[in-house]
């Protein structure tokens, strides 16, 4: 299927498409920038944007030189903003290789008087940076410059040797050099006395807490809260959240302003307003500040001997380009602060904990932008706090996107249901004449079906003449394609696109036969865009040539006036699915039978290996629970205990027989009743809480009745129908560790006695001082991580010890790093911290999962001097039990998915078989042929019944509802025997029907498909147990018992006899449910016997010399005509 903007469902294709769009957009950005540079004051913004948006190679630069020059200028500018100065150093010698022209004056206070003869500036190319700062400052700077992840130590506080003035040195590493931004510490500002992110995190603590307290489910609420918090934190006049759409254009989705400013909420702007190169820079340098767009830029002087040009991409001081400054001034924004919102891109790394797993791909979701009408400077610590806040915001955006993705998956499932529903109708007219119809399949403004030269239209569509025009165009220019999807018929080259007006811009069309087509239509994007910006005052006119938000909005509307909302990949998948179904609906029955055979082959492939795997896992799970050295107990849906293993009995002193039957809440401490009650209630709803701490009572003769403390995970027990039937609690006894921690918190003096104690009860403990340096690392941590105390002490806890790249203990991803920082920050600010799940890769590459508890360390005056972090590890048995549980769940889920797929795939060809049979029934058939069709119909009904069996437990437990249908035993018996004929013929087994004619023609009432299923299963088992050349016979009797004037109860007894040694005893034990493990055939017999029991019957098996017999008895009803 062709597409002017291809819609592919694969991730690789989507990325390729995205990369191609970025390259094309960068070329357009370069052309626009070149026009701006050439035009100067005569630059016409609106017309330039319109020109660059027009398709066609003639509009693009004639060569790559324009693009290369543009990218070089963006990345390697030679100017900085004047609110600070910049030095570039040789990484090995610490000598200056480049400096900004204002650096000598700012850092060495060069006199403005005329210098005396021979006087040289104190700072220039080749100067050793250590000579211009005080001794302690030079030492701190040298230590930072030798650091691996140098940016983790930002900012470094330094003092000039000549003036004593304090500066923040902000360092980052680029290829072959170190770049240092120096920003003066303002007189009113309390200088940050040590490096480390923790110092900045404190500034954003309130905002982070509010973001984390938000309920999920509303991206709008999340964005509104973010702009409100940044507004209060930074004090800018306007704060906005920009979101980038799939086609790279942007939209203001949240905004807050001071009174008197025009709102920009709802503003859409072209992709060129924030060029791709600028977006790349935002990914590298996530916070960007412009203090004064009118300030004169300062040149950077570079050593002429350098073999390369320095890049200032990572420098906050980097000067903005003139076109951006003009845009700012036109909108009366003199200063700005921009934070990048970077989220995960697509289906990347899942929950795998493999240490070799790469980090997730990232993409720029949007920006948080602050504007001010006057110059404004934000100190580095506050900018760092804003960057961290943006990372927390990005994590929540990720979660909202994942939630939207889940809703999307549900919509896809709904779509599949619609497709199946459409298939069962009169194809294809039912999909337009009934409800739901094809407009319910995807979001659209209109749809049409062209079938047998007739047009059936829904909603807003082209006229019949225009639609035939589109078909002719498709047939001429897309001959080899099965369809077309485009968001702009104009851009796709359809000659009559402009005549369609605003009603039809985008179209998805698919061919369903030689002359049959399906169409979906969308109107132009501008119809869905609403701008909440300021309205024009009477007499006011806009200058469209200037770069301004209102001009951007007009330019955006101009660009999209012939374009609709793009077709999503999942929408095209749904359309393709319907296309395939309709194209295949007319295939003959042989093709359907072939498909059915393939499905049956897949079913046969799903053999005993899956069941044995599940059974082995289940058996191992039961054994582990019974013998585990961790407490495990379980309750039913009423909260009454039905499981109580040896370890929990040992800890509580309550034997198993006394515990079973008690309500769980009667056994826990009063202080824990609410916690356990909530945990139990959520678990019964399927919401499994983890790492919940509560206390449970102890029993016994000893005087010590202190409760035991447990950390508990709830696991909902489910039946085959996925209904919750109970809750299993897997716990860990932390009484000893809790006592140690309680003792620790009470200690005022020698805490080292605990930290350095090698006793096995002491958990892994590490600590940090108030500046973020690792200050404690006990022997348990060394054993757990493989890193010695000397390896980690005096390293940055966040980044060097625990980080995402070159850290000792690597965290799984950036989200884990940010969450860890939030926990440490909250504890440092005095907040109570609950235990959280924590994980990292040890030195040997093994992933460690544990619970993290953070406690603040206080001095005698009560001031926070650092943090202690305790890790609680699950025991080996518990880890193994949880591992086995995960394996069991994964295996079960895998098998369920396969079964769900096969059940779904069976239904389509089955519907085709039914359709073919109905078509045959309408033809002239002989009596024998009609009988064959009736047998086929009986087998199809039986198969449908089995496909509907999603809850086997209901059958086993006797809760299945049986149907009451009128039938003749002859029809059921013939259909049952037909299912074994191929196998019996293959073994040359003779089938003898000893049923009397009267019995076969008796009219009975009951669940005939279920009776047929039962007989077919027992017949198959008998055939399997009969030697080749043997004999199988079927006989039966019917005993009637009148229970009313018009109804008689009938006891039907069917005997299936076969020669040979008989059915194996093991298989019979499985049928009667006495075996814990059952084979595929055993489960089939067990289900059949349970179905017989549901019919008030029973199954027996008799062995005789050389012959064995199944005796199946069931209760049915016989209807008699009442006398008139």
Curated annotation (Swiss-Prot):
Gene3D superfamilies: 1.10.287.130, 3.30.450.270, 3.30.450.40, Histidine kinase-like ATPase, C-terminal domain (3.30.565.10), PAS domain (3.30.450.20). Contains one covalently linked phytochromobilin chromophore. SUPFAM superfamilies: ATPase domain of HSP90 chaperone/DNA topoisomerase II/histidine kinase (SSF55874), GAF domain-like (SSF55781), PYP-like sensor domain (PAS domain) (SSF55785). Residues 1-14 have a biased composition (Low complexity). Keywords: Chromophore, Photoreceptor protein, Receptor, Repeat, Sensory transduction, Transcription, Transcription regulation. One of its GO terms (molecular function) is protein homodimerization activity. It holds the Pfam family GAF. Belongs to the phytochrome family. Regulatory photoreceptor which exists in two forms that are reversibly interconvertible by light: the Pr form that absorbs maximally in the red region of the spectrum and the Pfr form that absorbs maximally in the far-red region. Photoconversion of Pr to Pfr induces an array of morphogenic responses, whereas reconversion of Pfr to Pr cancels the induction of those responses. Pfr controls the expression of a number of nuclear genes including those encoding the small subunit of ribulose-bisphosphate carboxylase, chlorophyll A/B binding protein, protochlorophyllide reductase, rRNA, etc. Homodimer. This is Phytochrome A1. The gene is PHYA1.
């Amino acid at each position: 299927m062709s597409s002017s903007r291809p819609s592919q469902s694969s991730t690789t294709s989507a990325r390729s498409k995205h990369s191609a769009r970025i390259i094309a957009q960068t070329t357009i950005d370069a052309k626009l920038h070149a026009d701006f540079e050439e035009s100067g004051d005569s630059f016409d913004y609106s017309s330039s944007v319109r020109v660059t948006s027009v398709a066609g190679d003639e509009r693009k630069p004639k060569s790559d030189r324009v693009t290369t020059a543009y990218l070089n200028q963006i990345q390697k500018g030679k100017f900085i903003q004047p609110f600070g100065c910049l030095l570039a150093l040789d990484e090995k010698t610490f000598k200056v290789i480049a400096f900004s022209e204002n650096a000598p004056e700012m850092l060495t206070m060069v006199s403005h008087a005329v210098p005396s003869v021979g006087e040289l500036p104190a700072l220039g190319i080749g100067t050793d940076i250590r000579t211009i700062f005080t001794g302690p400052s030079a030492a701190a700077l040298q230590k930072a410059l030798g650091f691996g992840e140098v940016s983790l130590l930002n900012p470094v506080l330094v003092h000039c040797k000549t003036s004593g003035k304090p500066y923040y040195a902000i360092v980052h590493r680029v290829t072959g050099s170190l770049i240092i931004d120096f920003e003066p510490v303002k007189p009113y500002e309390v200088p940050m006395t040590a490096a480390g992110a923790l110092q900045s995190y404190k500034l954003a603590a309130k905002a982070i807490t509010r973001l984390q307290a938000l309920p999920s489910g509303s991206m709008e609420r999340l964005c509104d809260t973010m702009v409100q918090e940044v507004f209060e934190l930074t004090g800018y006049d306007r704060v906005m959240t920009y979101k980038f759409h799939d086609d790279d254009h942007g939209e203001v989705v949240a905004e807050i302003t001071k009174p008197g400013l025009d709102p920009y909420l709802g503003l859409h702007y072209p992709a060129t307003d924030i060029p791709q190169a600028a977006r790349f820079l935002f990914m590298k340098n996530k916070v960007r500040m412009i203090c004064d767009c009118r300030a004169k830029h300062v040149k950077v002087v570079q050593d002429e001997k350098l073999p390369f040009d320095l890049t200032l991409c990572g420098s906050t001081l980097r000067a903005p380009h003139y076109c951006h400054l003009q845009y700012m001034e036109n909108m009366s924004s003199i200063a700005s602060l921009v934070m990048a919102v970077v989220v995960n891109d697509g289906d990347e790394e899942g929950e795998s904990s493999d240490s070799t797993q790469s980090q997730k791909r990232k993409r720029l979701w949007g920006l948080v932008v602050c504007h001010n009408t006057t110059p404004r400077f934000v100190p580095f610590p506050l900018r760092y706090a804003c960057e961290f806040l943006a990372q927390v915001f990005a994590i929540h955006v990720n979660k909202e996107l994942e939630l939207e993705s889940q809703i999307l998956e549900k919509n896809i499932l709904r779509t599949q249901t619609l497709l199946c529903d459409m298939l069962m109708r009169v194809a294809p007219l039912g999909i337009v004449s009934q409800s739901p119809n094809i407009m319910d399949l995807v979001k659209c403004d209109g749809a049409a079906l062209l079938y047998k030269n007739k047009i059936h239209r829904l909603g807003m569509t082209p006229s019949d003449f225009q639609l035939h025009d589109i078909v002719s165009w498709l047939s001429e220019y897309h001959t080899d394609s099965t369809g077309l999807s485009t968001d702009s018929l104009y851009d796709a080259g359809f000659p009559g696109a402009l005549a369609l007006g605003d009603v039809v811009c985008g179209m998805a069309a698919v061919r369903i036969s030689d002359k049959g087509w399906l169409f979906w239509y969308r109107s132009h994007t501008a119809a869905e865009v609403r701008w909440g910006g300021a309205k024009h005052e009477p007499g006011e006119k806009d200058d469209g040539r200037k770069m301004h938000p209102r001009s951007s909005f007009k330019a955006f509307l101009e660009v999209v006036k012939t374009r609709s909302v793009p077709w999503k990949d999942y929408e095209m998948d749904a359309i393709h699915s319907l296309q395939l179904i309709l194209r295949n609906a007319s295939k003959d029955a042989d093709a359907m039978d072939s498909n059915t055979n393939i499905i049956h082959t897949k079913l046969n492939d799903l053999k005993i290996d899956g069941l044995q795997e599940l059974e082995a896992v289940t058996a191992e799970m039961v054994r582990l629970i019974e013998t585990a050295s961790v407490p495990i107990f379980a309750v039913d849906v009423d909260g009454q205990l039905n499981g109580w293993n040896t370890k929990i009995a040992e800890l509580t002193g309550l034997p198993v027989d006394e515990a079973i039957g008690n309500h769980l809440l009667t056994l826990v401490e009063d202080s824990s009743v609410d916690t356990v009650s909530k945990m139990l209630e959520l678990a019964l709803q399927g919401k499994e809480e983890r790492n919940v701490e509560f206390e449970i009572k102890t029993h016994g003769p000893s005087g010590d009745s202190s409760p035991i403390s447990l950390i508990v995970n709830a696991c909902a027990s489910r039946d085959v129908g996925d209904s919750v039937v109970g809750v299993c609690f897997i716990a860990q006894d932390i009484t000893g560790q809790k006592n140690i921690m309680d003792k620790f918190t009470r200690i005022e003096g020698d805490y080292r006695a605990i930290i350095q104690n090698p006793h096995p009860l002491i958990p892994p403990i590490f600590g940090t001082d108030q500046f973020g340096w690792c200050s404690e690392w006990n022997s348990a941590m060394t054993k757990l991580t493989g890193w010695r105390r000397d390896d980690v002490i005096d390293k940055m806890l966040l980044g060097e010890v625990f980080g995402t790249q070159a850290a000792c203990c690597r965290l799984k991803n950036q989200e884990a790093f940010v969450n860890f920082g939030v926990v440490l920050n909250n504890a440092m600010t005095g907040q109570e911290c609950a235990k959280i799940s924590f994980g990292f890769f040890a030195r040997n590459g093994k992933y460690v999962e544990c619970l993290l508890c953070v406690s603040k360390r206080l001095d005698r005056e009560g001031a926070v001097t650092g943090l202690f972090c305790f890790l609680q590890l699950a025991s080996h048995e518990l880890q193994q039990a949880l591992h086995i549980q995960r394996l069991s769940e994964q295996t079960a889920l895998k098998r369920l998915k396969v079964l769900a797929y096969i059940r779904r795939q069976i239904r389509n060809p089955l519907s085709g078989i039914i359709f073919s049979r109905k078509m045959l029934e309408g033809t002239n058939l002989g009596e024998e042929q009609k009988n064959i069709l009736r047998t086929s119909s009986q087998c199809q009904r039986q198969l449908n019944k089995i496909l509907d069996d999603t809850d086997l437990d209901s059958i086993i437990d006797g809760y299945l509802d049986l149907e009451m249908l009128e039938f003749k035993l002859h029809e059921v018996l013939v259909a049952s025997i037909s299912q074994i004929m191929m196998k019996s013929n293959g073994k040359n087994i003779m089938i003898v029907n000893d049923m009397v004619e009267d019995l076969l023609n008796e009219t009975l009432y009951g669940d005939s498909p279920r009776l047929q299923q039962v007989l077919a299963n027992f017949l198959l088992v008998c055939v399997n147990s009969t030697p080749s050349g043997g004999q199988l016979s079927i006989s039966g009797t019917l005993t009637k018992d009148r229970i009313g004037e018009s109804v008689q109860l009938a006891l039907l007894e069917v005997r299936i006899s076969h020669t040979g040694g008989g059915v194996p005893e093991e298989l019979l034990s499985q049928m009667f449910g006495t075996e814990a493990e059952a084979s595929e055939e055993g489960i089939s017999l067990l289900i059949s016997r349970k179905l017989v029991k549901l019919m008030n019957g029973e199954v027996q098996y008799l062995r005789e010399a050389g012959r064995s017999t199944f005796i199946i008895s069931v209760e049915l009803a016989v209807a008699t005509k009442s006398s008139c």
